[in-house]
UniProtKB/Swiss-Prot annotation:
Gene: ung
Annotated localization: Cytoplasm
Segment forming the signal sequence: none
Organism per entry: Mycoplasma pneumoniae (strain ATCC 29342 / M129 / Subtype 1)
Task of the protein: Excises uracil residues from the DNA which can arise as a result of misincorporation of dUMP residues by DNA polymerase or due to deamination of cytosine.
Keyword Cell cycle: no
Name this polypeptide is given: Uracil-DNA glycosylase
HAMAP family in alphabetical order: UDG
Source species, domain of life: Bacteria
Record keywords: Cytoplasm, DNA damage, DNA repair, Hydrolase
Lineage, uppermost ranks: Bacteria, Bacillati, Mycoplasmatota, Mycoplasmoidales, Mycoplasmoidaceae
Enzyme class, broadest EC rank: hydrolase
Amino acid sequence: MEQLLDQFLSGVLSEWKAFILQEAKQTYFQELLAKLKNVEQELTPKASQVFRPFSFFAPNNTKLIIYGQDPYPNPQHACGLSFASNAPKLPQSLKRMILRLQQEYPELAGQNHWTKQLLEGWAQQGILLLNGVFTTNAFQTNAHRNWGWEQFNCHLLDFLLSQKLYVLLVFLGKQTENFVLKKIGGASQFASLSYPHPSPLTGRKFFDHPDALFKQINQWLKHHNHTPIDWTNGQVQYQF
């Protein structure tokens, strides 16, 4: 199990690593690792990418968390960051997120050259791109639900609370929202926004949601004296 944990921690920054190593001592996490070690199918994402969200910035630079549900079941798509993919053909959920971005910023319509590794650039700006469940079996959704990742996510929020941070939680889909909001209760250090999941399975709900997604995030950040997110990573000029 130690070997598997070492793979998970590949590239993780020191302050996040210290938190994860403390979690790894707990019974729930030991049981999670044991289950993962005994899985006969291929894991997605690969082990060295499971904790990739924690490789871009220190905890005290966390601005917001964008939550998905669980990783893409296709190993070619999953890369450790929720919704992100380095595959040549973008997954439908990521395509629809880009379309929503262009819907809110019409000047970006038709701009496709910046989509490669787009969400990695968001992560570099202080966004934790997390799934409620960090792993699954290849080509199987929700295979590791209720294995312990939910508890890890809740303890992560406790850790952020201990850092005296005021963090925006953005939920794309109800599965993660349900257990996270139950955990944080009325904690004043967290604000939240809720949207439908961008999967095609939700139909037009993601596009028809009346509140802006990306613009509302930046309005919140500016209100709390944070630099707004450049959703195009500096590759396209537009107004926040």
